[in-house]
């Protein structure tokens, strides 16, 4: 006998449904993900309960989910042979937005059983995602172990109420039929549904099946009859999660094929790590380092992050909460049993659990790179060529791992004589001179400019190695990486060289004597250059060049000024310190000039030469050329 009743939803469902349908989900095709997830959840519940009551299987222990579409009627049906629901269960679980039978089910579990129970759907809104595409939803369900005439019919148009009736249903489980809106009829297509299943539910452990039509008898090419085939249910998903299998059972080829599947990359990955974490947070991660950088890696709007699965069900792409920006090249996934999600299952809750998992995964990736650098330097150079500049963002972004990231950086160096960035900070430290306490470096516009900078002259003479940096990000990097393993990084273009014990007593005495002898010359140049410079000094870093400019301690460097200007940032006026080399013939002859006008011209010429060498350009190149021509003409005979 029919027992139809009309119920109002237990919360302000009309408003909540409207909010969810229009705001909660970012793409409507995930309604199928949610419903398949619920169906797989029901199958897992039955599997668990049947451990102690095998009769619940009712002679059918092959658990599965079946999906079918009817183009003419504009419907999609998702059917499972899982645990099903009673009338009270339907009213309770389908009548309340924030209710989830799964969450209650977890409360009844204890011990190791709860660890193994493959349950998903912590939030009750998943079912209501059906209304994103459906104008009406019909649910037919019978709880396992109940009589056929105790089945339930639930119907709603998502407008704030629903009807419940008693029906007869021979098979246990739940059948959900979506009556699609006119503008959503694209989903009543088998191929469309198959593509969604492959995308979102490929690795659910329960088989997801679709009906494959049979073929009539036909004539073959050689005249023989090709027999007819009957229609059958065909499994659409792989029904196995590769990352949940033992590493020993997975071949390199399988890992590489899976990488291509999740990344859409055509080339093999450089390396990977497959790991299960147990403890306060339990999750599995499968992480890949690609061999090639994506073309849009530097696009700030490009999404990055890991694929997120909960119990092998795909939740989202680009879960950036688990991966810092400087590791945005990493591909892979994370699968958790108890990961906290917000109510939409789209955006992760930013809490201590998420942060702890992010910390663990970050350390895992850094460990992968450290091992690669140690075991295969050539392969690491391949990685560095593709992703090194991104990794250089790390010290500014990740203070906790700054030292580890610094150990992974690679630079060109005066030691190798090559432009290839192959030198690590540990390599540099291993070659430091006795008494050397600093790591010397220079940042310039190009490798050639850095390698040929006059600032290196004294250091080269003493055999002191200098790191050569010429990437745009290097100045930013060095502002956040001031020391490594208690060794300060020191710019050879800023302030004093601070050679310390590398300078012997005789050299110090000679330098002091030269400075005393040049006091008058320094004062004359100061007067000639006026406000063009912050100061004039006798250099301690030049041997073959007449003069150079340096930034004062605490002042903005030339490269940082360029970086800010390129970003459209206001830059304060910075006057350089002008260092002269009295031992150079040009400076020596300058000191002999009695004509103050000529002295000023030559002083300006040397200053602008030094600025051109340091900056690669001048604020007023025409004035420089005019002065140069004037000086050439005056000295031509």
Swiss-Prot record:
Single Gene Ontology MF annotation: ATP binding
NCBIfam families xrefs: PRK05218.1
InterPro entries assigned to the protein according to its UniProt record, in alphabetical order: HATPase_C_sf, Heat_shock_protein_90_CS, HSP90_C, Hsp90_fam, Hsp90_N, Ribosomal_Su5_D2-typ_SF
SMART domains, per database record: HATPase_c
Cellular location(s): Cytoplasm
Stretches the record annotates as B: 346-562
Top-level division of the source organism's lineage: Bacteria
Source organism of the structure: Shewanella baltica (strain OS155 / ATCC BAA-1091)
Family per similarity comment: Belongs to the heat shock protein 90 family.
Main function: Molecular chaperone. Has ATPase activity.
Cellular component GO terms held in the UniProt record: cytoplasm
PROSITE patterns (UniProt xref): HSP90
HAMAP family, sorted: HSP90
UniProt-recorded name of the protein: Chaperone protein HtpG
Assembly and interaction partners: Homodimer.
Pfam family, one: HATPase_c_3
Lineage, highest ranks first: Bacteria, Pseudomonadati, Pseudomonadota, Gammaproteobacteria, Alteromonadales
Alphabetized UniProt keyword annotations: ATP-binding, Chaperone, Cytoplasm, Nucleotide-binding, Stress response
Region of interest (A), residue spans: 1-345
Region feature (C): 563-637
